[in-house]
C-alpha cells in the first residue's frame, strides 16, 4: 500500500513538474496580423534568429542575425550582412565593427535590444526567417504588406492573450500593436 502511494505521489509530482515547465518556459512565437500562428517553439537564451530579405530600394540581399536575450524577454541584434549601402542599413563605427567579407559588408557587435519585432512582407522582398535552424519563407505564406510579429512569451501568458484579448508581459510593456 505504501509503495503504491509513493509511486502515485512520484507520478503526480512528475506530472506537475512537466506541466509547470510547459506553462512557464517561454516560447518564441511568430504570428501574422491576421492571427495565423506561423511558428511557436520553446525559446532559450542565445537561440538564433535570422531575418533575410531583399532590400526594397537597393534590390540586394540583407541578412540580420539576432539571438533571444539572456532574460528570455526579447531579442539582441548581433550582426547585419548586406551587399550595398542603402537606406536603413548600418555603416557608422559607433554601430559596431564594420568589415567586408567577399561581396558583403558586415556590421558585427551591434548588441541592439528589442522587446519584440514587427516585420512586413513586401513585393519582391522575399521575407524569410530562420528560427533555430528552421526556415520560414513568410513571403510564400502571406500576402504582400502583411505584418508579422515575433516575440518571446510564457505559454500561460500567450494563452491568456488568445482567450481574453489582453496583452501581458513584455509585449504589453513595449506597447505591442
Predicted regions and their residues:
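Covalent nucleotidyltransferase core used to form phosphodiester bonds in nucleic acids
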Residues: 85
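A residue-level signal for beta-strand positions that form part of recognition/binding surfaces
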Residues: 27, 48, 74, 104, ...
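N-terminal secretory signal peptides
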Residues: 31-82
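Hydrophobic membrane-insertion alpha-helices, especially the h-region
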Residues: 7-23
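Positively charged n-region of N-terminal signal peptides that target proteins for export
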Residues: 1-5
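Aromatic-capped interface at the extracytoplasmic side
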Residues: 18-34
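Mature, soluble, non-transmembrane domains
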Residues: 77, 88-177
Amino acid at each position: 500500500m505504501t509503495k503504491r502511494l509513493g509511486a502515485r505521489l512520484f507520478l503526480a509530482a512528475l506530472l506537475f513538474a512537466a506541466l509547470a515547465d510547459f506553462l512557464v518556459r517561454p516560447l518564441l512565437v511568430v504570428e501574422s496580423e491576421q492571427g495565423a500562428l506561423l511558428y511557436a517553439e520553446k525559446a532559450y537564451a542565445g537561440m538564433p534568429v535570422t531575418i533575410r530579405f531583399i532590400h526594397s530600394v537597393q534590390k540586394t540581399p540583407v541578412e540580420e542575425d539576432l539571438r533571444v536575450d539572456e532574460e528570455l524577454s526579447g531579442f539582441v541584434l548581433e550582426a547585419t550582412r548586406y551587399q550595398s549601402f542603402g537606406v536603413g542599413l548600418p555603416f557608422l563605427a559607433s554601430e559596431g565593427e564594420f568589415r567586408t567579407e567577399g561581396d558583403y559588408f558586415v556590421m558585427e557587435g551591434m548588441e541592439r535590444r528589442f522587446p519584440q519585432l514587427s516585420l512586413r512582407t513586401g513585393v519582391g522582398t522575399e521575407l524569410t526567417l530562420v528560427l533555430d535552424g528552421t526556415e520560414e519563407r513568410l513571403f510564400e505564406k502571406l500576402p504582400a504588406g502583411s505584418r508579422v510579429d515575433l516575440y518571446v512569451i510564457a505559454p500561460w501568458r500567450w494563452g491568456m492573450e488568445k482567450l481574453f484579448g489582453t496583452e501581458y508581459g513584455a509585449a504589453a510593456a513595449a506597447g505591442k500593436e
